[in-house]
Design a protein with these regions (language model features):
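Bacterial N-terminal signal peptides
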Residues: 15-25
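Primarily a LysM-type cell-wall glycan-binding module
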Residues: 41-75, 115-150
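Sec/Tat signal peptide C-region and signal peptidase I cleavage site
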Residues: 26-30
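Sec-exported extracytoplasmic/periplasmic mature domains
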Residues: 53-60, 78-86, 97, 101-105, ...
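Gly/Pro-biased beta-strand-loop elements
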Residues: 180-283
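Exported/periplasmic cell-wall-interacting domains
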Residues: 250-322
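Extracellular LysM carbohydrate-binding repeats and other cell-envelope/extracellular binding modules
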Residues: 71-117, 159-189
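Bacterial N-terminal signal peptides that target proteins for export
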Residues: 2-17
Length: 322
């Protein structure tokens, strides 16, 4: 029953388009929307960035917030419109803007601390050298702060053009999105749609409560299909490097334990599936999410992987479909 409801919802979502909007100081009047979003489909647009933040707060992710209109932002916005009983027109209208309502400012200021600078670390090219480290930390403050704001590193630069990237000195004030959100809902089930490279979470009533872009296996034969379930959840996991997975038939057969951290191959969260060796996990390169490039698992941006890990539990059902 729940899975049938989910299919209906996703069928509706697949037929929609996009728009723009923003809250922060308050509700924008409908007649202001066209002027405010003039040229929003071309290049970096600050109001699109703010729209992406608002959707991210609702767990409807475009992946990396970047201020650029694209298919992922369109899907997230259409989803929000449908979930709130609005036509998925892709046009900022009175009903849409009024429904979003008021909230805290979309952008906030963050000051770089000594602790931030001390939390950086190296990232060797060699797997064996990586295995000897205590953790695979962020390499630059730019990388760290971009993930903190759910941003692409390029968008972080655009918001802060005068900062000394990639490592602004301690005391530098940085503008970041405020991606704070309400308590995460419990997921009653998960649906992974391969054709749309997305992971959707539903509550026990079958209502969609989160939508995250994901990466899937490059090799179609390695893509799971059908009913699965969550078997394990591990925040900040380590990773077992198997050289045979990367170079089948090669001489190297020595497995290595790669320490945890944001630049670990599975990022900051691991959700193990009932299919041995498969999981949903984070990634050190969030900008690449949405591609068919994994070895078989499902990748999410670290911030979305952490969210999903907090929403599921052992036994949560998962359906993988085309």
């Amino acid at each position: 029953m729940v899975l049938r409801m989910m299919s209906s919802i996703q069928a509706r979502l697949a037929r929609a388009v996009l728009v723009s909007l923003i809250a922060g100081a308050g509700v924008v009047r409908a007649q202001e929307a066209p002027e405010r979003f003039a040229g929003y489909r071309s290049g970096f647009h600050r109001d699109i960035l703010e729209l992406q933040v608002l959707l991210d707060r609702k767990n409807l992710s475009c992946n990396c917030i970047d201020g650029i209109w694209g298919a992922r932002t369109e899907i997230a916005l259409q989803t929000w419109q449908l979930l709130n009983g609005l036509p998925a027109t892709g046009i900022p209208d009175a009903a849409f803007l009024e429904a979003l309502g008021r909230g805290p400012p979309v952008l906030t200021r963050y000051t770089v601390t000594e602790e931030d600078a001390a939390a950086l670390g190296p990232f060797p090219d060699d797997w064996e050298e990586r295995s000897k480290l205590p953790a695979l930390r962020y390499v630059t403050l730019q990388e760290m702060l971009a993930e903190k704001g759910h941003l692409s590193q390029r968008a972080l630069q655009r918001l802060n053009p005068d900062a000394a990237w990639p490592n602004p000195p301690v005391g530098t004030e940085i503008v970041l999105p405020d991606c704070s959100h309400d308590k995460l809902p419990q997921a009653g089930s998960i649906r992974i749609t391969l054709g749309r490279t997305e992971i959707a979470a539903y509550n026990a009533a079958g209502d969609l409560v989160a939508l995250f872009p994901c990466s899937i296996a490059r090799d179609k034969s390695r893509r799971p299909d059908g009913a699965l379930a969550v078997r394990t959840v591990a925040p900040n996991p380590n990773y077992t490097y198997d050289p045979q997975l990367f170079a089948p038939g090669g001489e190297n057969t020595v497995k290595l334990i790669i320490p945890p951290g944001p630049n670990n191959p599975v990022g900051l969260a691991w959700i193990g599936l009932s299919l041995p060796g498969y999981g949903i996990h984070g990634t050190p390169i969030p900008e690449n999410i949405g591609r068919a490039e994994s070895k078989g698992c499902f990748r999410l941006a670290n911030w979305n992987a952490v969210k999903l890990l907090q929403m599921v539990e052992t036994g949560t059902p998962i359906l993988v479909e085309e």
